[in-house]
Swiss-Prot record:
Major site of localization recorded for this protein: membrane
Gene Ontology CC: plasma membrane
Protein name according to UniProt: Elongation factor 4
Organism annotation: Streptococcus gordonii (strain Challis / ATCC 35105 / BCRC 15272 / CH1 / DL1 / V288)
Keyword match Ribonucleoprotein: no
InterPro entries associated with the record: EF-4, EFG_III/V, EFG_V-like, EFTu-like_2, G_TR_CS, LepA_C_sf, LepA_CTD, LepA_IV
Length: 607
């Protein structure tokens, strides 16, 4: 194609993504758009087509983002090229959202006609506004009996401040309003602005590992053209690769002769390891490089850390390979080897949040068949030592000696909880119990309230979300962002079995709750750890001080069964002998800790 044709083609390109809170109908809308543009034949159509992982389908959530090219013939008779970039809606996967928004010019904001705006809708809208995207509101599910499109329209205008007078009323399930959405994309979303003649600049927004072709980069071309045979260079580390193939996704990968400005597609260049390709990096040509990289999206840092150990210790290498493979597609997963006296060899992994942690654990067990033990999640604490040094600690067993600690700071989050009015009391009580500080409360409409709290991240990591859902019958929606570090009175609690510390059961707790947490855990462990031949004390300790203790009684055999009557000294001799045996056993005996014991530290409910 010559330059004129390329420029004409660029004017017909529309890049957009769909943003929504979980369950507001985003993936269904994407399905309808694919059908309406006849991208996918009716034979291949299946629900949630873009959610290609089994896990995504089962949980009904979108985890990875997907990019697809569609052709749409508009009412003006012209054919437009749409690139739909599907994004996750869950708070843990915001980094996936920020990546996909960096590749777009417009966003369709889907809001449920019955539920209205939710916390994550807001979070994603702000991300879109930061990226200067044109936002098209769509009020979905208008065929529901509880739908109230006018109220939702007013909400969009009041809470977000978008003009919703032209918002499309749609039902993705029933296929209503799909055409209007497509026409709005043509009219309102701007065409890409880049320059075809400039040196190549392409933003990597995802990478996938393919066993045959190496790492495949998913890119949005901002300036210039790339074609097979070119030598590309990555701007962050200067490495060069030869392009073997470029193409687009129409869910399936289809090879093309070139990718030009405004295109969204993939580049294969036999790249061996994913560590070479950072998501958010800029690809340029080695012989005609761009002068400066694109300002990509922000690098996400893990917030939650946990140890992962294989139950069978010979699976350690398999676990490492599995984690490396997952890391290929998931730039935000971090891990490093660690050892534990109780659990053997494993890895300390960093995750963006709890759902992310859950999903990774499930994928390891499901796709790689590795049975895992996971230790209690913890966050990064800043520990200020008495000699003036400050260290970051994410693993309770690495905490320094209490005598050397001057103060400990922990991360706080700003939590936005949107909830119907009748549950405000329950939410406030929960937040208070989790050491939250009240910030402010706004009414969104007559019934819904947006409550904002500052809460320690460590409290949210445990089971805040489940508790929130159960105390509000599932009506609350929740979104959080890290706000600051504050100093807190935190202590490290060790659990001792038979006088030995079990490092994997240590956890960090606020001084006020130390006693009850300790008591709770020793009581729980007592129920879980099987009785031994000797008595086993379970203790919770802070430093040298024991704060709670309980004993597991010994199993005993009746050694007197064979004495029929007879002399009392004979019986005493047998009992003394048994006692000495038990004592010897206790001195050398070790206690098997079942997997449930580690999980019980996690589900620390005040039951």
């Amino acid at each position: 194609m010559n330059l004129e044709d390329l420029k004409k083609r660029q004017e017909k390109i529309r890049n957009f993504s769909i943003i929504a809170h979980i369950d507001h109908g985003k993936s269904t809308l994407a399905d309808r758009i694919l059908e309406a543009t006849e991208t996918v034949s009716s034979r291949e159509m299946q629900a949630q087509l873009l959610d290609s992982m089994d896990l995504e389908r089962e949980r009904g959530i979108t985890i990875k983002l997907n990019a697809i090219e569609l052709n749409y013939t508009a009412k003006d008779g012209e054919t437009y090229i749409f690139h739909l970039i599907d994004t996750p809606g869950h708070v843990d996967f915001t980094y996936e959202v920020s990546r996909s928004l960096a590749a777009c010019e417009g966003a369709i904001l889907v809001v449920d006609a019955a539920q209205g705006i939710e916390a994550q809708t807001l979070a994603n809208v702000y991300l879109a506004l930061d990226n200067d995207l044109e936002i098209l509101p769509v009020i979905n599910k208008i065929d529901l009996p509880a739908a109230d499109p006018e109220r939702v329209r007013a909400e969009i205008e009041d809470v977000i401040g978008l003009d919703a007078s032209e918002a499309v009323l749609a039902s993705a399930k029933a296929g209503i309003g799909i055409e209007d959405i497509l026409e709005q994309i043509v009219e309102k979303v701007p065409a890409p602005t880049g320059n075809v003649e400039a040196p190549l600049k392409a933003l990597i927004f995802d990478s996938v590992y393919d066993a045959y072709r190496g790492v495949i980069l998913q890119v949005r071309v901002m300036d210039g053209v790339v074609k097979p045979g070119d030598t590309i260079q990555l701007m962050s580390n200067g490495k060069t690769f030869d392009v073997t193939e470029v193409g687009i996704f129409t869910p399936k990968a289809i090879g093309r002769d070139f990718l030009a400005t405004g295109d969204v597609g993939y580049i294969a260049a036999s790249i061996k390891t994913v560590q070479d390709t950072r998501v958010g990096d800029t690809v340029t040509l080695a012989d005609n490089p761009a002068t400066e990289p694109l300002h990509g999206y922000k690098q996400m840092n893990p917030m939650v850390f946990a140890g992962l150990y294989p139950i069978e210790s010979n699976k350690y290498n398999d676990l490492r390979e599995a984690l490396e493979k997952l890391q290929l597609n998931d730039a935000s997963l971090q891990f490093e080897p660690e050892t534990s006296q109780a659990l053997g060899f494993g890895f300390r992994c960093g995750f963006l949040g709890l759902l992310h942690m859950d999903v990774i654990q499930e994928r390891l067990e499901r796709e790689f068949n590795i049975d895992l033990i996971m230790t209690a999640p913890s966050v990064i604490y800043k520990v200020n030592l008495t000699d003036g040094e400050a260290i970051d600690v994410s693993n309770p067993s690495e905490f320094p000696d209490p005598t050397k600690i001057d103060s400990i700071e922990e991360p706080y989050v700003k939590a936005q909880i949107m909830v119907p009015q009748e549950f405000v009391g329950a939410v406030m009580e929960l937040a208070q119990r989790k050491r939250g500080d009240f910030v402010t409360m706004d009414y969104i409409d007559d019934n819904r309230v947006n409550v904002i709290y500052q809460i320690p991240l460590a409290e949210i990591v445990f089971d805040f979300f489940d508790k929130l859902k159960s105390s509000t019958r599932g009506y609350a929606s929740f979104d959080y962002e890290i706000s600051e570090y504050r100093s807190s009175k935190l202590v490290k609690m060790d659990i001792l079995l038979n006088g030995d510390k079990v490092d994997a059961l240590s956890f960090i707790v606020h001084k006020e709750f130390a006693y009850e947490r300790g008591k709770l855990i020793v009581d729980k462990l007592k129920k879980i750890i099987p009785r031994q031949q000797f008595e086993v004390p379970i203790q919770a300790a802070i430093g040298q001080k024991i704060v709670a203790r309980t004993d597991i009684k010994a199993l005993r055999k009746n050694v007197l069964a064979k004495c029929y009557g007879g002399d009392v000294s004979r019986k005493r001799k047998l009992l003394e002998k048994q006692k000495a045996g038990k004592k010897r056993m206790k001195a050398i005996g070790s206690v098997e800790v079942p997997q449930e014991a580690f999980l019980s530290v996690l589900s620390m409910d005040e039951e």
